[in-house]
């Protein structure tokens, strides 16, 4: 599955075996661990097995990981639809874009493409994202993509020193 934005400046596609080095670099970016549920590095082997065992079927895996490619087909980020609940017609979204590719519209275009896919192919009713309130770029990304800040989860994330509040961002399709 490949999805291109209307300006043909970026593409979303399924994770491929040749993405292992890129996935390794993103998953082991310690700055991102605070917004996820990991606190240990992933090995190449573990990530290789993840790629090989993924069916790329959101109904089977309950998640879909997409690689964000720039106009030169270089991987610059990942967009995940996860905690997919077909019965309730919803999923969560997460996105990570390399620092060198941030603030160039790639993230917003990727989110818009994923929303279109969620609406037209998956027939979802809503997508939500949990965003650290201190993560201003991510808050702006989701707000500018049409998500609404509908709730706050107090002390939801812990970085080893401080608890952080999280915005529950929702987009109704």
Residue ranges and their predicted role:
Residues 1-20, 27-29, 70-173:
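Acyl-donor (CoA/ACP) binding surface of acyl/acetyltransferases
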Residues 14, 25, 56-58:
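Short secondary-structure boundary/capping segments within folded domains
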Residues 22-25, 49:
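Short, solvent-exposed alpha-helical surface patches in well-structured domains
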Residues 31-53:
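Conserved GNAT-fold acetyl-CoA-binding loop/helix
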Residues 32, 60-63, 127:
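Secondary-structure boundary/capping residues
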Residues 34-36, 63, 166:
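Short, hydrophobic secondary-structure boundary micro-motifs
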Residues 53-54, 117:
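Solvent-exposed, charged/polar functional surfaces in cytosolic regulatory/catalytic domains
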Residues 54-67:
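A short helix-loop-beta-strand connector motif used in the catalytic cores of GNAT acetyltransferases and
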């Amino acid at each position: 599955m490949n999805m291109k934005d209307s300006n043909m400046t970026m593409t979303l596609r399924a994770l491929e075996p040749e993405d292992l080095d890129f996935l390794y670099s993103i998953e082991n970016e310690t700055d991102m661990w605070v917004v996820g549920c990991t606190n240990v590095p992933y090995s190449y082997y573990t990530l290789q097995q993840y790629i090989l065992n993924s069916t790329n079927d959101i109904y089977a895996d309950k998640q879909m990981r997409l690689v964000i490619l720039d106009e030169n087909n270089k991987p610059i980020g990942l967009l995940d639809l996860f905690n997919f609940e077909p019965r309730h017609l919803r999923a969560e979204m997460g996105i990570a874009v390399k620092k060198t590719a941030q603030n160039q519209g790639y993230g917003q275009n990727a989110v818009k493409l994923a929303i279109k896919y969620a609406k037209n192919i998956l027939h979802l009713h809503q997508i939500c994202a949990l965003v650290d309130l201190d993560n201003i770029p991510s808050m702006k990304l989701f707000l500018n993509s049409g998500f609404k800040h509908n709730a706050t989860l107090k002390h939801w994330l812990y970085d080893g020193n401080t608890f952080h509040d999280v915005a529950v961002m929702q987009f109704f399709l």
